[in-house]
UniProtKB/Swiss-Prot annotation:
Catalytic activity, reaction form: pseudouridine(1915) in 23S rRNA + S-adenosyl-L-methionine = N(3)-methylpseudouridine(1915) in 23S rRNA + S-adenosyl-L-homocysteine + H(+)
Stored NCBIfam families: PRK00103.2-3
Listed name of the protein: Ribosomal RNA large subunit methyltransferase H
GO annotation, cellular component aspect: cytoplasm
Length: 156
């Protein structure tokens, strides 16, 4: 099952780009043996997008039918790493071909412009910069795959 991060805007070269790429590469390598991956990232050009509705429509346009959709949202469910791993493993075992983790803009998602999500995921009530959320998500996806693969990366 492919795991994809769909995000608004582009991260230029720098420490955040390096970290995102590193975690996505690690996830692809670790997940290959257990049917998870490749890890991918879709960056949506925001220059012509004027509102959260426009942003959400642009995110929706890149979603494949049948993909599991996860919206990152402050009102979502806060899962620990093992719970996220369990959910990803369940989708894989059900034969899902792709799970897409959508990061909205500064004003969040316009839910009326997006398909019904399979999961709304929160990193808690705090507000984080967009670039940092991408790093955190990439790391959590790598961690989830590491848990499912039984590697020693995650410690309880």
């Amino acid at each position: 099952m492919r795991l994809r991060v769909a995000a608004l805007g582009r991260i230029k070269s720098g420490p955040e780009r390096t970290l995102v790429d590193d975690y996505l590469d690690r996830g692809t390598a670790t997940g290959r043996a257990i049917g998870l991956g490749p890890f991918a990232e879709s960056e949506i050009d925001t220059r012509s997008l004027k509102s959260s509705s426009d942003e959400s429509r642009a995110l929706a346009a890149g979603l494949d039918p049948g993909a599991r959709i996860v919206l990152l949202d402050e009102r979502g469910k806060a899962l620990n790493s093992r719970q996220l791993a369990r959910q990803i493993g369940q989708w894989r075992d059900e034969g899902c071909r792709e799970a897409v983790f959508c990061i909205g803009g500064a004003d969040g998602h316009d839910r009326s412009q997006l398909p019904q999500p399979d999961l709304m995921l929160s990193f808690g009530p705090a507000v984080f910069p967009h670039k940092l959320v991408r790093v955190m998500l990439a790391e959590q996806l790598y961690r989830a795959v590491s848990i499912l693969a039984g590697t020693p990366y995650h410690r309880d």
